C-alpha cells in the first residue's frame, strides 16, 4: 500500500506522517517513509537527526546509480520505520519535483518498493505542480492534513483537485482529511458538506504534538516515559486502522476557487449566532 500525505505548508504534515508511520508499524506493518521536501526534515521525529538525502548520496557517487546501495539511503527510525529523504536542489535553482522522480527511480532500482507493506510519501506544502504531484502517480490513497482555518482548507481543495486529475489515469482515491491541532471543526465540516469527503480524524489543540517536533520524537516515543500521552497516540492508531481497512475513499469533486472563497468567507463574515436560552427551551418543548 502506498500513501501520499499533502497539506498546507506548516500545517504539521511531517509530524502527522511520522506518527502515522509508527502507528502502522505497531499494527505489524513494515513501513518506509519518504520525505519529499527540499528541507529534508520529514523523518526528523523518527530518526532524531537530519539524515543524508538521496541527492547528497547521488552527488557523492557522481550519479552512478549502480554504486548506490540501500543502506546508503535508507535509515532506521523509531519503531522500526525505515526512512528516506529525497532532498532537493540548491535554493533558487533546479526543480524539486525532478528530485522526487529521481528518488522513486533509485528506490525502484534497489527493489525497495517491493520490500514494504506500506510506503508513505510526505510531500512538501500545498505545491501541486506536476513534479510534486508525482507521488500521487504511485499512491493508492492520498490524505490531506488541514486545520479549521481558511487557508488550510483552501489548500486542501487545490490538492483535492490534483487527486481528481491523477485519478483519471490510475486507481488513486482520497482517503480523507486529517484535522491537526485544532480546537474546533465547524469550518472543516462546512467544507466537507460542500465537497463530500471522509474526515479520518480531528486532533485537538494538544501542545505536546508541537513539542514532539522540537524534541525530534514521535508521540509514541514520548509516551514511553509519559504514559499520559497514550491517548494522543490513539488518534494516530485510529487513522492507521482506517487505512489498513482499505477504505473505499473518494474521487473528490473540488469546489471552484471563487465558490470556495465565498463559502469560507461567509463563515467568518456571517457567523451563526448561538441559540438563546429561550430558543433552546422552545426546541425542547416541540
UniProtKB/Swiss-Prot annotation:
UniProt keyword list: 4Fe-4S, ATP-binding, Chlorophyll biosynthesis, Iron, Iron-sulfur, Magnesium, Metal-binding, Nucleotide-binding, Oxidoreductase, Photosynthesis
Disulfide bonds: none
Pathway linked to the protein: Porphyrin-containing compound metabolism; chlorophyll biosynthesis (light-independent)
Entry cofactors: [4Fe-4S] cluster
Binding site for Mg(2+): 14
GO terms of molecular function: 4 iron, 4 sulfur cluster binding; ATP binding; metal ion binding; oxidoreductase activity, acting on iron-sulfur proteins as donors; oxidoreductase activity, acting on the CH-CH group of donors, iron-sulfur protein as acceptor
GO BP field: light-independent chlorophyll biosynthetic process; photosynthesis, dark reaction
InterPro entries on file: NifH/chlL_CS (IPR030655), NifH/frxC (IPR000392), P-loop_NTPase (IPR027417), Protochlorophyllide_ATP-bd (IPR005971)
Co-factor note (free text): Binds 1 [4Fe-4S] cluster per dimer.
Residue positions binding ATP: 10-15, 39, 180-181
PANTHER family the UniProt entry points to: LIGHT-INDEPENDENT PROTOCHLOROPHYLLIDE REDUCTASE IRON-SULFUR ATP-BINDING PROTEIN (PTHR42864:SF2)
Complexes and interactors: Homodimer. Protochlorophyllide reductase is composed of three subunits; ChlL, ChlN and ChlB.
Name of this chain's protein: Light-independent protochlorophyllide reductase iron-sulfur ATP-binding protein
Amino acid at each position: 500500500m502506498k500513501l501520499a500525505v499533502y497539506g498546507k505548508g506548516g500545517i504539521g504534515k511531517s509530524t502527522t506522517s511520522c506518527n502515522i508511520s509508527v502507528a502502522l508499524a505497531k499494527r505489524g506493518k513494515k513501513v518506509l517513509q519518504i520525505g519529499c521536501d527540499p528541507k529534508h526534515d520529514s523523518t526528523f521525529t523518527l530518526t532524531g537527526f537530519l539524515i543524508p538525502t538521496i541527492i547528497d548520496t547521488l552527488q557523492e557517487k557522481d550519479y552512478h546509480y549502480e554504486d548506490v546501495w540501500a543502506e546508503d539511503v535508507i535509515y532506521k527510525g523509531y519503531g522500526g520505520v525505515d526512512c528516506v529523504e529525497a532532498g532537493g536542489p540548491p535554493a533558487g535553482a533546479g526543480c524539486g519535483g525532478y528530485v522526487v522522480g529521481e528518488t522513486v527511480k533509485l528506490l525502484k532500482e534497489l527493489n525497495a518498493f517491493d520490500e514494504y507493506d506500506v510506503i508513505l510519501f510526505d510531500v512538501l506544502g500545498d505545491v501541486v505542480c506536476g513534479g510534486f504531484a508525482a507521488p500521487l502517480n504511485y499512491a493508492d490513497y492520498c490524505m490531506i492534513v488541514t486545520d479549521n482555518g481558511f487557508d488550510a482548507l483552501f489548500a486542501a481543495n487545490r490538492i483535492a483537485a490534483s487527486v481528481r486529475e491523477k485519478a483519471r489515469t490510475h486507481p488513486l482515491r482520497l482517503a480523507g482529511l486529517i484535522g491537526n491541532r485544532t480546537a474546533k471543526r465547524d469550518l472543516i465540516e462546512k467544507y466537507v458538506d460542500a465537497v463530500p469527503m471522509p474526515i479520518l480524524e480531528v486532533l485537538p489543540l494538544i501542545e505536546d504534538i508541537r513539542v514532539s517536533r522540537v524534541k525530534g520524537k514521535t508521540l509514541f516515543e514520548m509516551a514511553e516515559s509519559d504514559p499520559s500521552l497514550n491517548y494522543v497516540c490513539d488518534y494516530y492508531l485510529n487513522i492507521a486502522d482506517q487505512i489498513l481497512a482499505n477504505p473505499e475513499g473518494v474521487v473528490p469533486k473540488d469546489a471552484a476557487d471563487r465558490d470556495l472563497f465565498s463559502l469560507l468567507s461567509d463563515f467568518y463574515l456571517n457567523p451563526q449566532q448561538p441559540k438563546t436560552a429561550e430558543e433552546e427551551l422552545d426546541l425542547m418543548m416541540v
